[in-house]
From Swiss-Prot:
Listed EC numbers: 4.1.1.37
GO cellular component, one term: cytosol
Subcellular location as annotated: Cytoplasm
Pfam entry (one): URO-D
Record organism: Neisseria meningitidis serogroup B (strain ATCC BAA-335 / MC58)
GO MF term set: uroporphyrinogen decarboxylase activity
Record GO biological process: heme biosynthetic process; protoporphyrinogen IX biosynthetic process from glutamate
UniProt xrefs under PROSITE patterns: UROD_1, UROD_2
HAMAP family: URO_D
Top EC group: lyase
Protein name, as recorded: Uroporphyrinogen decarboxylase
């Protein structure tokens, strides 16, 4: 195996000493980059891009050519798993993802099962291909959606503003939702382990919609199943630990509970104060975040000020991976993203060493 030239990201996740705070950006391979748009046009559709090993590799590497990032993240989509379960994923123009066969009837839910991972071979092929293309530059992150977040799309049949269908099921037929969530948890565990086998050096679980739940519901219908996944993941590969990051958008209320599920790091959205979060979780986990994606729409000076504030809030020592508090917006200026990355590297050195 090719040795890593830059393992700062992996060391920070394990709270080991680093020279500076590493940074990557959620959705760093995406529509804000003109080169991404060109490759996407070549692919035909978003799903074709995900399923084309060569092009998925190309778009994963693109942001690394432009910015001095400390990690690459697999280019894929969280909905590959329910698609492999036979729900018929498609993307309606201007409407986002939809499923032809939403899970709204007991008979359909009874038939739901963990998909054969061979149906997701295109994802694992992409992981292997990206690792080869990276040639040890930086680590590669694999990822999946959380069981609850996947269930939101599977039950609603697409995105939703109020999640009425899944919440109705949760309160009126919790047994049905638990069946979906348990199947999802088993599928995600197998999926992430296969990504690790293919070469992913860290993995992130995205719980995009857990934050819409009440306190009790989050613990019962989201966190419980994320814990189940974390317990089933391979944590060693190629002779080193494979760190696990859990990111729950709107999850600031539950940091203490999330810190106890066995993950190595928690991702924070932009609404949390990272210094306060560090005090709340203590030494249990590293923290990732949490620059407001829309702060990239400010001036170069305001971007630098915001970076300085987040670094100062976190304070001295390792255990911080700088990131956005959510995915980068498609209208963000790539030049501003470069200012962000370079400023993090420049200003963070004072908080490390010595």
């Amino acid at each position: 195996m090719i040795s890593l030239k830059n393992d700062t990201f992996l060391r920070a996740l394990l709270k080991q000493p680093v020279e500076y705070t590493p940074i990557w950006m959620m959705r760093q391979a995406g529509r804000y980059l003109p080169e991404y748009k060109a490759t996407r046009a070549k692919a035909g559709s978003f799903l074709d891009l995900c399923k084309n090993t060569e092009l998925a590799t190309e778009v994963t590497i693109q942001p690394l050519e432009r910015f001095d990032l400390d990690a690459a993240i697999l280019f894929s989509d969280i909905l590959t798993v329910p698609d492999a379960m036979g729900l018929g994923l498609y993307f309606a123009e201007g409407e986002g993802p939809k499923f032809k066969r939403a899970l709204q009837h007991e008979a359909d839910i009874a038939k739901l099962h963990v998909p054969d991972m061979e149906k997701l071979q295109y994802v694992f092929d992409a992981v292997t291909s990206i690792r080869k293309a990276l040639d040890g530059r930086v680590p590669l992150i694999g990822f999946s959606g959380s069981p609850f977040t996947l269930a939101c799309y599977m039950v609603e049949g697409g995105g939703s503003k109020e999640f009425r269908t899944i919440k109705t099921m949760m309160y009126s037929r919790p047994d049905l939702l638990h069946k979906i969530l348990d199947t999802n948890a088993q599928a995600v565990t197998a999926y992430l382990n296969a990504q690790i086998d293919a070469g992913a050096q860290a993995v992130q679980i995205f719980d995009t919609w857990g934050g819409v739940l009440s306190d009790a519901a989050f613990k019962e219908f989201s966190l419980k199943y994320i814990r189940q996944i974390v317990a089933g993941l391979k944590r060693e590969s190629e002779g080193r630990r494979v760190p696990v990051i859990v990111f729950a958008k709107g999850g600031g209320l539950w940091l203490e509970s999330m810190a106890q599920i066995g993950a190595d790091a928690l991702g924070l959205d932009w609404t949390c104060n990272i210094g306060e979060a560090r005090r709340r979780v203590g030494k249990q986990v590293a923290l990732q975040g949490n620059f407001d994606p829309f702060a990239l729409f400010g001036t170069p000076e305001s971007i630098r000020t915001e970076v300085a504030r987040i670094l100062a809030d976190y304070g001295h020592g390792s255990g911080h991976v700088f990131n956005l508090g959510h995915g980068i917006n498609q209208h963000a200026d790539p030049e501003h993203a470069k200012i962000l990355v370079d400023t993090v590297h420049e200003l963070s050195r004072q908080y490390h060493g010595g």
